[in-house]
């Protein structure tokens, strides 16, 4: 296997040479490594430096980069696992080069997690984490970290695949990125509560090509009940921008109060807050000292997530303006107009044209048209 050196954060490691002319270069190497996931890995290192779990499992290590970085930059006991025998020599070589006390195993991830528990478990498969979620929950003492890259099924572009994998109906809406994140959160919640455990989102976010969940798992029937109380549906009008949030497991038939069209249920999904402001604040305070390559991007993400309203959906206000046949205002003008009208409003990390607000739809329409400018 031909390898080259790469560096992320303060960690230097070996990765396989990729064919840069391929349609998806990471898939051309014998062992998988995706450079575009550096932000994801940086966020993991930063979060774990705050949480300080007693040990950590990188359940699907591939090159082992994520686990290597956690061991080297966070300084906690790490196990790196991969079921591919071809990946193990490279992981071991990287461990030896760094002189790290890391345990390396070659196991099926589910089998390992059924037999052994870790304080923090990281599941980062190629595609959907759904087949590994139950084992991940059973093998996690406190912190469960999940990545999904099957954004098309999660966001409703591949509807039947989304229903099969997550037992939920996605929605290909103007806020499909948030739908995907909340569908995945809802799925993990339902898998967790059957063990009389609950979930507490610490830092969950979505990018163009992946969704990342960082969760604290809590114990007891009451914790499970609190999680169930945060599950429900979004009822979306197929014609206009109207939607409403509906807690509970069984959505009734409803019609849009503006169009009269039947509302389409999206879910079940997670309706609660997707991050902990306390944890995000601690991550921001620690960020400048971590030497991360995506520091500026991560700082922007953390700031936006802290300011983002906890509502369960957002508006792509450019898309709404197109429906209204008007030119969209500047986003700050729109936010100020909504606030001046007495409502909360914020940007969203999902999209540069995403706006969250608790304003009724007519107020949002007027603000986009410029009728209630401050």
Curated annotation (Swiss-Prot):
Keyword RNA-binding (UniProt): yes
The EC number(s) this enzyme carries: 2.1.1.216
InterPro entries recorded: SAM-dependent_MTases_sf, Trm1, TRM1_arc_bac, tRNA_met_Trm1_C
MF annotations from Gene Ontology: tRNA (guanine(26)-N2)-dimethyltransferase activity; tRNA binding
Family per similarity comment: Belongs to the class I-like SAM-binding methyltransferase superfamily. Trm1 family.
Catalytic activity: guanosine(26) in tRNA + 2 S-adenosyl-L-methionine = N(2)-dimethylguanosine(26) in tRNA + 2 S-adenosyl-L-homocysteine + 2 H(+)
Secretion signal, residue range per the UniProt entry: none
Species per Swiss-Prot/TrEMBL record: Methanoregula boonei (strain DSM 21154 / JCM 14090 / 6A8)
Binding-site list for Zn(2+): 237, 240, 256, 259
Example of a GO biological process term: tRNA N2-guanine methylation
Protein name: tRNA (guanine(26)-N(2))-dimethyltransferase
UniProt cross-references to SUPFAM superfamilies, sorted A to Z: S-adenosyl-L-methionine-dependent methyltransferases
Keyword set includes tRNA-binding: yes
Binding site for S-adenosyl-L-methionine: 41, 66, 82, 108-109
Record function comment: Dimethylates a single guanine residue at position 26 of a number of tRNAs using S-adenosyl-L-methionine as donor of the methyl groups.
Sorted UniProt keywords: Metal-binding, Methyltransferase, RNA-binding, S-adenosyl-L-methionine, Transferase, tRNA processing, tRNA-binding, Zinc
Domain called Trm1 methyltransferase: residue spans: 4-368
